[in-house]
Each structure stands twice: as C-alpha cells, then as structure tokens.
Amino acid sequence: MKKNENAHKKMWEGRFSEASSKLLEEFNASINFDKNLFEEDIAGSKAHAKMLGICGILKKDESEAIIKGLDEVLAEIRAGKFAFKIEDEDIHMAVEKRLSQIIGAELGGRLHTARSRNDQVALDFKFYVLKKNLEISSLIKELIATLTNLAKNHKDTLMPGYTHFQHAQPVSLSYHLLAYAFMFKRDFERFVSSYERNNLSPLGSAALAGTPHKIDRSIVASELGFADCTQNAMDSVSDRDYALEILFNISVFMTHASRLCEELILWSSQEFGFVSISDAYSTGSSIMPQKKNPDVAELIRGKTGRVNGNLVALLTTMKGLPLAYNKDMQEDKEGVFDSVATILSSATILNEMIKTAKFNEKNMLKATKTGHLSATDLADYLVREKNIPFRTAHFITGKAVAKAESLGLDLSELNKEQLKSVDENLDENAIKFLDLHASKEARTSKGGTANKSVEEQIQILDDWLK
C-alpha cells in the first residue's frame, strides 16, 4: 500500500458502491461550524494516542509519531494554513485526513482504534463547554466585583424602590445594585455547578457499547483534566445535558442582565434622569443631532431573546431522540457557539458600561419625594406604638395618603396638624416616621436596606470575591 493511498477517501466509504452526491456532502457536513472545536479535537486525539501507547495497543514510537503529527496539524490550523473542505464532513475527519497525509495513511488510520466519532464528538463538545463554563464564570465574577465596589459608594444615595413599577419604599442605590450582584452570584454558582457535575470524560465509550480493546479510559480523563470517566457508554454518547445546562445558564444570566439593562435604559431617559451612560458606550442618531442612545443596553436586552431561542431549539431537538447517537444531535453546536459568544461579549461590555456610568443622586432623591414612600413606616408605627391591628393601621395610613394628595403634597410633607386631622392616633411622634432616610434606616432585618444590613451584604460579597 502506498503511503497516502487512502488519505483522500472518506473514512467510512468501504461499504458504499456509489460516491456521495454533492447535495449530500453539503447537507450532511458540519465542518463549517464544528471546526471551532479543533483545539479540543486535537487535544482529545493526542490523549487517546498516548493512552493507546501506554496500553500497548500502539507501539511507543507509533503513539509518539501520531502525537507529533497532530501537533503539526494543530500548528497549521492556528497559523491559518489549514484548508477546511466540505468533503471532509467534520472536524474529526478533517484532522484525521491531514494527519494521514503527514504521517502516512497506515499509521494515521490507527489513531481511531477503540474510538468512534460518537464518543469523539461527545468529548470535543463537552471539553469545549466545560472550558467555556469557567471562562464565563470568571467574567461574571468581575461583574459582581464591579457592582459590589459601586455599592460601597452609594449607601446613602436615596432612591425609590419599586413594585409594579410604582414607587413603593425608599431604598439606597447601593441596595438596588446589590440585588443584581446577588442575582449574578447565583448565575456564577450555576456555571460552576454545571462544570463540576459534567466534568467526566466520555472518550472510550466508542459508538454506544464500549470497546473490546484493553484501553484505560482514566488515562485520557487524567490527561485532559477531567475528574473521572462517565459510567455508561450509551448514556455518554447520547448525553447533551452539559450543552442544555450551559444554554439554560446563559439564558438566566442574560435575563438578569436584560433586566438591569432595561432599568439603565429607563433611568437614562429624560423622564428619570437617574444615570448618564458614558459616551464610550452610547451611540447617536443619523438625523437627530441631540440624541444619545443606550444601544449597548438595548442590544443586550435584544440578544437575550436569541439565546433563549437557542435553549428552546436544543430542548426541542433532544426531546424525541431514542438512544443512542442520532444525527439530529449535530444540531447541538451552532446554538451553543452563538450563545457562548453572546454572553462573553455581553458580560464584558456590560461590566465596562456600569463602571463608567454616572448616577445622578439629586434626581434620585427628588424622585423619592413623590409616591408616598414612607406610608408603610407610618402603618408600622401605628402597629408598634399604638397596638393597632395592621389592617386598621393600613386603613388609617391610606386616609393620610388621600389627605396628602388632596393637598397636592407627598405624605412625607404633611405637618403634625394635618396628620392629626386624619386620625387621633397620628400624634406628634408619628411625624418622624415620615422621614425618608429614617425609613430606609429602619429596615435593619437581614437583607434589608438599612446601612448596617447593606454593609453586611457587601461584606458577604467581598469575602466571597477573595
């Protein structure tokens, strides 16, 4: 046999008497997108070749020659000198074909011993997803640090807290920002948890039932940094939980980010004037010279819809598949690649946009003077000091709110006489409970908005970030 006799052929064509149609090659191929897995594919092949050598399935010099050849293929791809061709079908066949051209078809053909593309692609894709879990979690941690540091400077910046998008109770900007920090902390924990749960190597599972070759799967797992091997070969090649999990985790993060961006969009409007987004992260209008648009925040909000769609797409693809591998599963990658790229860019630019944003403390304080934010404090005063049932206190306070509105005032602006005219229980001591800063500071319960509680929350995050 000549050295490169089979190097140009499809690796599976022995059983076929007709060549593949051009239509099939174009429809069936995944090389245009799974070439993104070249690093993982070659790393997996090198570990597999090393294991075959250690187990005596390949001679030591054969194993070393294959690994050296794979390094050459890797160097070519990194240098942009590798020609990806549609007829090569996928990254696995493209790499093996080029390897066979470099070291010879006979030796190159030995690499696939005790391996199927089913477990090979499971390894490549899982390896990629695991690495991205760590990369994403690192960016989220940076975002949490930014929010935590910003919160330290705004413990006394008073603003309205909202329910139903109506003014509810006075809170600090620090407290509001920390709410997002703790959201993103949960996101971080989901990515880390997914990494830990899925950190098992599927390589060596072969097509679906294992292999008769005397391999040692733990060698490959250790070489690639996996914690262990998967336990069932059929499950290993059928499993895409790790892909679904990263898509879900990305969707939840992007949903949280979208909520934050929605607020930044609103807060940067003239109606609110709570924040000014840096020129570096804003755009203008082609026709209106005065415009300063929060396009970064709007794009993150918009991209959230797309990543949510990627999750639903893969869930739908997987829902009806019998065991084990099916070609439908080739559709697992593009959505993941897209969602991963989206969260990496979104988390990075969101962090920078928040770092450079300027908050208007005066406008935030002014906003607290409407909406009767101290109403709950007045009701609580009646319960604590006058021993009035909360429902009765609620009714009395509601009358006080109505009185304020009839006078064109905020509840916090009523004087002693005006309060007393509503109900005799609203005595001169009640007036101090209408103060908005006092209202904020009264909420000392764990997780509350009082400075003492906020400082505890900041300390929790600081300790966690170390």
Swiss-Prot record:
Xref: PROSITE patterns: FUMARATE_LYASES
Top EC group: lyase
One Pfam family of this chain: Lyase_1
Catalytic activity, as annotated: 2-(N(omega)-L-arginino)succinate = fumarate + L-arginine
Pathway(s) this gene product operates in, as recorded in its UniProt entry: Amino-acid biosynthesis; L-arginine biosynthesis; L-arginine from L-ornithine and carbamoyl phosphate: step 3/3
GO MF annotation list: argininosuccinate lyase activity
Main location: cytoplasm
NCBIfam families assigned: argH
PANTHER family on file: ARGININOSUCCINATE LYASE
Protein family membership: Belongs to the lyase 1 family. Argininosuccinate lyase subfamily.
Name of the molecule in the record: Argininosuccinate lyase
Organism: Campylobacter concisus (strain 13826)
